[in-house]
Every structure is written in C-alpha cells, then in structure tokens.
C-alpha cells in the first residue's frame, strides 16, 4: 500500500510540474509576442474639427509599458491640416494679418505651438507608464507612482493586439 501512495504522490507532483511548465512556456511565448510598439488612431473633438490624424502608441518592453504620442509625427499631421484648412477656406494673407498675425506662416507657427502643447504634451504628461504582467490571456498594468492596477483580457492575431476591456485594436508597428 505504501508503494501505491508514493507512486500517486510522485505522479501528482510530476503532473503539477508539467502543468506549471506548460503555463510558464505559454506565458513566456505570449510575452515575447506582446513586446514591441503598437499603434492605433487616436482622436479628440478638436482633432476631428481640424481633420487631423493622430496616432497613439503603446510601447511594451521587458516588464515595462508606456502610452505616448509622437511629437514630430503629430506636428507633420497638424501642418498638413492647417494647409488644407487655409486652402479650403480660401483664407488670404490679408485675412490673417487683419486677425492680428504677421503672416500665414506666423499664424501656423502660433497655432502649432499651442496645439502641440494642448494635444501632445498634455497627453504625454498624463499618459500611463509602468510595469506589466500577463497570466493566461490577462494583461495586468500597474501604473508608476500610483496604486492603480488595470486588468484586461487580450489576444494577438496576425500582428493585431486586441485589448478586450476597452475595445482597443492596435497594430504592431515595431
């Protein structure tokens, strides 16, 4: 009887070790698949009014994450939107000078400075960063400097990351 009990115990322990190893390997593969930079189209009411394309990035590195907007990319999108606005509204240099600007370029420069601050700088200042963990299809974010934790189910299909709770769909860019 004692041999049977020992075999059972050994079998149970080996079984548990196999299950733990499979879970560890599965999560390890998922971690590697998750690491990189992901992007999705981001918008604000102001950006929609201006018809400017914004992109939010989600960067995942070894144990760390951060959300951010690229300043230079946003700058290029804003300048393109300003050009379209001036063309579509048929605004002249005289119209801009009458509004208190020195020139169309001066107007764009002032708008750009303000918009970059209000869109990109404010966003990046408030965007989350911290550590992360995954466990069997659940992604846990732990934000730096706070006790806030955010948990969501996720899946990755064909370089697309689906964060279920928010309904976010991100595409891998790096």
Segments from the language model and where they lie:
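N-terminal Sec-pathway targeting helices
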Residues: 2-18, 22-23
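Membrane-interface motif at the C-terminal end of an N-terminal transmembrane signal
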Residues: 20-32
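Tryptophan-anchored aromatic micro-motifs
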Residues: 30-49
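Conserved glycine-centered beta-strand/turn positions repeated across beta-sheet architectures
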Residues: 35-37, 67, 152, 163
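Short beta-strand segments that buttress and anchor functional surface loops
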Residues: 39-43, 139-145, 163
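N-terminal glycine/threonine-rich, aromatic-flanked beta-hairpin/loop signature
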Residues: 49-140, 144-153
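Short, exposed beta-strand-loop hairpins at the edges of beta-sheets
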Residues: 144, 151-166
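Short, low-complexity, Pro/Ser/Thr/Gly-rich segments in the mature regions of secreted, periplasmic
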Residues: 165-173
């Amino acid at each position: 009887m004692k041999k049977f009990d020992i075999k059972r115990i050994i079998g149970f322990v080996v079984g548990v070790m196999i299950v733990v190893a499979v879970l560890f390997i599965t999560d390890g593969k998922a971690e590697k698949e998750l690491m990189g930079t992901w992007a999705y189209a981001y918008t604000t009411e102001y950006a929609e009014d201006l018809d400017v394309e914004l992109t939010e990035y989600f960067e995942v590195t070894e144990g760390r994450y951060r959300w951010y907007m690229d300043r230079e990319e946003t700058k290029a999108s804003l300048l393109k939107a300003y050009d379209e606005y001036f063309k579509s509204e048929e605004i002249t240099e005289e119209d801009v000078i009458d509004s208190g600007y020195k020139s169309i370029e001066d107007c764009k420069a002032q708008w750009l400075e303000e918009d970059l601050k209000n869109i990109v700088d404010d966003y990046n200042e408030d965007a989350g960063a911290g550590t992360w963990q995954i466990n069997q299809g659940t992604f846990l974010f732990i934000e730096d400097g706070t006790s806030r934790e955010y948990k969501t189910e996720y899946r990755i299909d064909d370089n697309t990351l689906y964060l279920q709770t928010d309904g976010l769909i991100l595409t891998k860019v790096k």
